[in-house]
Every structure is written in C-alpha cells, then in structure tokens.
Amino acid sequence: DKKELNIFGRYLYKGYFEEDLDIPIEVNNRLKRTHAWFVSDDDPYIEVSKHLIQQNIYIIADILSHELTHYYLYKHDKPYDDKDIEFYALTYKNGISRTESTIIENGILKYEYFKNESKCDCGFKIESYFPVIDNEFRPVLMCPKCNKPLVYNAIGAIYRDFMPGFKLKMTCDWYEREKSK
C-alpha cells in the first residue's frame, strides 16, 4: 500500500544517500507504459504504477531507487536526466539499474539481459548475464582452473527474472528482517 511504499522509499533514500526523504511517493493507477517516474514540479514527488507495487521487493527497490536517484540529484542542483553522467555514476555506484528494458510476462516484470558464454582453452566454460543497459561494465572473468582471462561470447539478449546486485539485495533483505521484528 501507499503508506508502506513511502516507508520503504524513506528507508532506501536514507540508506543510499544518508539523508531523509522529504517528498511523497504516490501510486498512479493510470501509469501503464512506465513503472515509475520522478516529477520535478514546484512540489516534486515520485509516482509509481499499480503493477510495480505488485512485484517482488527487489524489483520495487530497483525501480524506486532509480527514481530516488533522480530526486537526489535534482535536490542538489545537479543534472538528473537518465543520460547525464552524474546520474549514470550514482546509479552505477549504488548498483541500481539506469533505465530498464523490461516486459511484463504473466504479471511478472522481466528485465532484458545479454547472455554470454565464456570458454577457456582448458575446457572450462561458464554462462553469464548482464543487463542490456550496463553491458559495457562487465567484470573480467578468470578461469578457475588455469587463471587465464575468459573471453565473452555474446549469445543474444533474453528476458528473465531480475537479478539484484549485492548492495540492493542486502538492503532489501535487511529491510524485510527489520520489518518482521
């Protein structure tokens, strides 16, 4: 519900930006093409779609944190559009998706990932997935058998369940644990 969403938003904002959130988060039942957006009016606020609040906590946190990043930069008079380097750097630092490529499949939000297969001369191979938007920030993978760098071989793009980064996952898990006390 809206009250819980605002509590969660304040928790995320405090965790990521070490400040108190001072704008409301509204639920807009008419939002269909976007999951959420930051509205920079005279009285700024964040709107989220009804279908977003029906997703799992990690998806809600990822998309809400994306909008909270817009607000944080706006509040501090910094460039806050998706294409701005300040926005890019802050979302990357915090492990938040910049702009998600998603579809809704049977009521579940799916993110687009590049699927890669990396092989080594020694016979070791591994599959990996990276968000389409952040494909240029792939880690260097090393073969655990012979310690050589693995070469990425792109297989294609697929839609699959969201895979939260470590910081986002830990933030959500901690929130859930605290809420259940």
What are these regions (language model features)?
Residues 1-58, 75-181:
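Metalloprotease/metallohydrolase-associated module, dominated by Zn2+-dependent proteases
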